[in-house]
Amino acid sequence: MGITKKFLNLFKSGKAGGDEEEEWEEVRILERTAHYDNFLIALSEGDLDTRWSAVRSVGDLGEPFIGPLIGGLKDEYWIIRRGSADTLGKIGAPAVGPLIAAFQEPGEDVRQEIVRALQLIGEPAADPLTQALKHNHPLIRRGAVQALGVMCETRAVPGILESLKDPDSGVRQESAVALGRIGDPQAVGPLIETLNDAKESVRMAVMATLCSLGEPSILPLIRALTDPNDDIHRRATLALVTIGEPAVEILINTLGDQTPAIRKGSVEVLGQIGNTRAIPTIMDVLDDPERSVRIEAVKALAALGVPAIAPLMQAFREGDVMKRTSAMEALWMLGQPATTPLIMVLKDDQSDVRKRAALLLGEIGDQKAVDHLTGLLADQNVAVRREAFEALEMIKKRTAQ
């Protein structure tokens, strides 16, 4: 019989009919024997099988083995690290303090097992972990916030929000990740404020969390589009694009907002999301009083592609001056897909439509427009003939290149 098994038999045995005090006296005696020392040696220095047996066996024996089990979290073999974490989880509350202190170990593999043990312990670990958010060691603060996130400890949210301002970037990054795991909407505002963090890793974690929070993030992110800080604007845009479909309806509604920066940012995001449901509303923005908003609407419609051509052609023919001009720019940006619809209006009753269509076809430079433009050289309107000639010259030059 091996030393581990002998010890456990002695440790767990009780005399039939003996009282509890007598059994615990036997335990205390055993702790002073060489058997106990040898058991600790087996736990920390034995071969893989011996260490594994020891780790799996001491869960019911309690506090005396916390130290060696903490050491087991640093073992070279994953099976020992995982077994040590599971056993510490069984020991429970007495292991919480030593586990939190062990976060000072820099290894990610060790930290993962500490977090696992604390998660297994659960409720008794919550308050000590929350208090550890104020610890003077950054690795302990980082580990504490990571564990609270994995445990989805909602009561810790105020403390984790404060940790978004921690001087250590690792703590700030883990705080953003933890808030995503917990999923509390009250985190959205502070997270958006952290979009301009000095560290890219923190900014990326914040964006990922805002995206995972979904709908509660949308309106605050849209408001962030007005931020004068270009980095915040860019990251808010990227977050909204990543959220995607759930943001479309809200973005469409904000195209009527009184703030030009919100209209501009919203139409930009809609173009990048690429949902064609937004086309009719974006078309309305083509005659927005703000030039910057109109420019973004043009870009958005061009990005939306072929489905935008029909409404753009309608605006090209029937819109007011501002809307026609914006539609022309969008059609030019669309390029060759717009060639056939433009060829079709070369015979429009309105000379202005024919002239502008010829101009655009020249700018697009598609060879298949040549014959149709050549026919326009006999147009009764001199301005149309001139534009057709210029368009043909432009196409010829591009072909020569």
Task: Report residues per predicted region.
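Polybasic, Ser/Thr-rich amphipathic helices
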Residues: M1-K15
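Structural detector for internal amphipathic alpha-helices that build alpha-solenoid repeat scaffolds
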Residues: K12-R32, D49-E63, G71, I79-A93, ...
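Short inter-helical turns and helix N-cap capping residues of alpha-solenoid HEAT/ARM repeat scaffolds
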Residues: G46-D47, E76-Y77, P106-G107, N136-H137, ...
